[in-house]
C-alpha cells in the first residue's frame, strides 16, 4: 500500500508553514556546511528551469557540479529559489548573495553571486584563501 510507510520509514504530517520553516532550516544548514555565514533569508520565488541546458548554461552547470549538484534531471521543472545574504565573503565584498534551488523540499542547486554590474557568480564551495 503506497500510503503506508515501509519498514524504517516514518511519515510526518506538517502544516505548510512548518514545511517552509523546515526547508529554510535545511537551506541555512547547507550554506553553513559549505562555510557560509548568512544574514538570513532575503527572498524566495518560483522559477522555471529551461527545458534543456544548451551551451549557454555550460558554465552554470559546471558551477553546480563543483558543489555536487546535477541540474539536468530538473530541466523544465519549477523550483523555488531561496536567496540569502552572505556575510563572510573572503574579499569582504558587500551585497553578496547565495541562491539555493529547491525542488520538492530537496536542494538541487545553488550559487554565490553579487548583484553588481561587474559582479561574479561562483559555486557554493567556499573559496580557498
Model regions and ranges:
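Extracytoplasmic electrostatic interaction patches
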Residues: 75-129
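N-terminal, intrinsically disordered, polar/charged segments of Gram-positive cell-envelope systems
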Residues: 2-40
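Intrinsically disordered, low-complexity N-terminal regions enriched in serine/proline/glycine
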Residues: 9, 15-18, 33-35, 56, ...
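Intrinsic structural disorder
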Residues: 1, 36, 68-69, 96, ...
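Mature extracytoplasmic domains of secretory-pathway proteins
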Residues: 33-93
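Accessible peptide chain termini
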Residues: 1-2, 129
